[in-house]
C-alpha cells in the first residue's frame, strides 16, 4: 500500500465552462476519448485510496467511477452546500477531514498531468511555468522552495499553481482549515489559504510540471483537446 490517499474535489458547478457543465459534472467533460476524471484516476498507483467529493451531478460522477473502476478503492463524501452562501473549495475539502487522517494529495478534478512518482519527504505544491496570473493563483519560489502563494492578478511570479499539492503535515492542514472556516465563509477559500498559514511552520517544495492540461475554463479546454 502507498502511504497516502488522494482527494479529488468533484462537487463544484464548473461555472467557468459555461453550458458544458449545465447538464454534467466538469470532471466528466471529455479530453480526447476519456473524461478528465479517468486521466486523474489512472495516473495513480493501483492500490491508492481515493476520496471524492460529490455535489453538482454527483450521482453521475459516482455511477461513472463505480462502472469504470469497480476495483478501485474510492470513498465518496457528499457536499451539502456546493453553490450557496458559505460554499467554497475549502468547505468541501473540510468535509473529508475524517477520511484524510494521513498524508494526502489534493488533486482538482479539472487538472490533468502526466503520471508522476510522488515524494512525501516534505509538503509540496505543483506549478507550471506558463499561464496567466489573471486566471490562476501563482507561486513565488526560491531554490525550489515555496516563498508565497499569490492571489490572481499578481505581476511577478515564478509558476502558476495548477491545483495539485501534497500534504504531509495533515494535522496542521486540518487545524488551519478549521480556524479559517470559523472566521470567514467567503466563496474564494481554498487549499491555498491553508498552505499560506502552514508556511509559518512547515516547508513546501515546488514541483515543476512540464505538462499540464487545465480543463477548468473554455479556452484552456479547447487547447487541451
Where in the sequence are the language-model features?
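Short beta-strand/turn micro-motifs composed of small residues
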Residues: 10, 54, 108, 128
Amino acid at each position: 500500500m502507498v502511504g497516502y490517499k488522494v482527494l479529488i474535489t468533484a462537487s463544484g458547478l464548473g461555472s467557468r465552462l459555461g453550458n458544458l457543465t449545465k447538464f454534467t459534472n466538469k470532471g466528466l467533460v471529455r479530453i480526447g476519448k476519456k473524461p478528465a476524471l479517468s486521466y486523474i484516476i489512472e495516473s495513480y498507483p493501483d492500490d491508492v485510496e481515493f476520496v471524492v467529493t460529490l455535489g453538482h451531478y454527483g450521482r453521475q460522477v459516482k455511477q461513472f467511477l463505480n462502472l469504470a473502476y469497480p476495483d478501485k478503492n474510492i470513498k465518496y463524501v457528499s457536499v451539502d452546500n456546493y453553490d450557496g452562501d458559505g460554499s467554497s473549495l475549502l468547505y468541501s475539502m473540510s468535509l473529508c477531514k475524517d477520511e484524510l487522517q494521513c498524508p494526502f494529495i489534493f488533486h482538482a478534478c479539472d487538472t490533468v498531468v502526466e503520471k508522476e512518482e510522488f515524494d512525501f519527504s516534505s509538503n509540496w505544491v505543483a506549478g507550471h511555468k506558463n499561464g496567466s496570473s489573471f486566471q490562476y493563483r501563482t507561486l513565488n519560489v526560491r531554490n525550489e522552495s515555496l516563498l508565497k502563494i499569490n492571489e490572481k492578478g499578481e505581476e511577478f511570479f515564478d509558476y502558476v499553481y495548477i491545483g495539485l499539492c501534497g500534504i504531509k503535515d495533515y494535522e496542521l492542514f486540518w487545524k488551519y482549515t478549521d480556524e479559517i472556516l470559523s472566521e470567514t465563509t467567503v466563496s474564494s477559500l481554498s487549499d491555498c489559504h491553508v498552505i499560506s498559514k502552514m508556511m509559518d511552520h512547515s516547508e513546501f517544495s515546488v514541483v515543476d510540471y512540464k505538462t499540464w492540461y487545465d480543463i477548468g475554463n473554455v479556452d484552456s479546454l479547447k487547447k487541451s483537446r
